[in-house]
Amino acid sequence: MSGTAQAGTVLTVAAAPGVTPRLLRLPAAVETHSAYLADGGYALLDNVETLLAEVDRSGLLGRGGAAFPLGVKLRTVRAAHLRGHETVVVANGEEGEPASVKDRWLLRHRPHLVLDGVRLAARLVGAQRAYVYVSDRAAALAVDHALDEVGFDTLGGLDISIVTVDPGYVAGEETAAVRVINGGPAKPADKPPRPFQHGVAGHPTLVSNVETLANLPHVAAHGAAEFRSAGTEASPGTFLVTVTGAGRPPALYEVPHGVPFTDLLALHGVSPDQVRGALMGGYFAGLLDRAVLDTTLDHETFRAIGSGLGCGAVAILTDDCPVAVAASVLAYFDRENAGQCGSCFNGTAAMAAAAGALRDGAATAEDVARLDRWSVVLRGRGACATLDGAANVAASLLKRFPQLVEQHLAGRCETCRDGTFSAQRPYEVEASRS
């Protein structure tokens, strides 16, 4: 089994039944400037404080993985502006997570929605400069064309630049984005300081995910109460979920937070009886067994079971062996780490080697014990969260699939006997759509 990497496969794009899309635009042609204006885009902002209050009440959480409240970020950078500091906005569209496609899709198909979100964020924090940070060539071209269409005056005098970078897992980390814009390497920096303290050119900087910013125009146009009409109390609004695996073409869905996981399966055409588990949050949040069938898609539910929604990427495991999937993901972390923190460089290599040996039936009980120990002691020891992601994958494999681990120790995994899952970039998906 060569794996289920799905690069180049046609992407299904749809909203959940009964959901009026806020982020997706169907059919999925590239939205023009005139079409966006006709829908009320680039509306004048009368009162900054009023919109800030609405963002606070909306409870809009970051869609990049950490689910940090956008209102808190905005107010922190705005406070620096009010103290007389120059401020900057960065729209982070470097979607380094191979199993996620949402940000690239928005940048390619709805660049004006993203730019409108950047415009509003800049007004809220008092910024005159902003950057759209991307690694996808098609996304960069779409944004560049949109900037030519929209004009300087519509943006309120905001100077927006596009910064491109080679794709990479760590390149999307917020301090890596700032380093690239400042002329440095696409590698995370030690924290503190964080970008809101000392970012682009040393100025307080709001770094926010593309999908997060794309929600701002909806809040501005319709208010917090309407935004909260979808989702849960703690996880309000809709969000974009990239679904891969299960032997089916990849898909990008817009769903409300709180929807049952089984509803997502039905939308994707997968029977719960087929499901062995899921790889959650792209590669970061680790593996879940069939307990995932009892979940709802919101941050509070997944935190309670030791997992996470992360960037909203869900890989459904049906025929793939979770041990082999974990080994592939850990090998990816080993290749993709920045190579600048010894604990991460050595830790990801050690975990990848142990998981690879387990997949191949060559591991010992001592290897598994070491993998278990590393998944605990290595957390929080890198400049970014790459090592934490690797630890999550290792820990969740051992916790959720102990019987499979034992089968691999005994060299008798029936799934791997038919061919080992060995994708270099497991569940990778492109933003293409026919």
Role assignments for model-derived ranges:
Residues 124-130, 246-249, 336-337:
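Short, surface-exposed connector motifs at secondary-structure boundaries
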Residues 102-113, 204, 208, 253-256, ...:
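Short alpha-helix boundary/capping segments
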Residues 41-57, 85-87, 93, 103-107, ...:
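Ferredoxin-type iron-sulfur electron-transfer modules in oxidoreductases and energy-metabolism complexes
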Residues 139-257, 268-272:
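Hydrophobic alpha-helical positions that pack around
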Residues 115-121, 256-272:
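Short amphipathic, charge-patterned alpha-helical segments
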Residues 137, 245-246, 270-296:
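Short acidic beta-strand-loop surface patches of small beta-rich interaction domains
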Residues 1-185:
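Iron-sulfur-cluster electron-transfer modules
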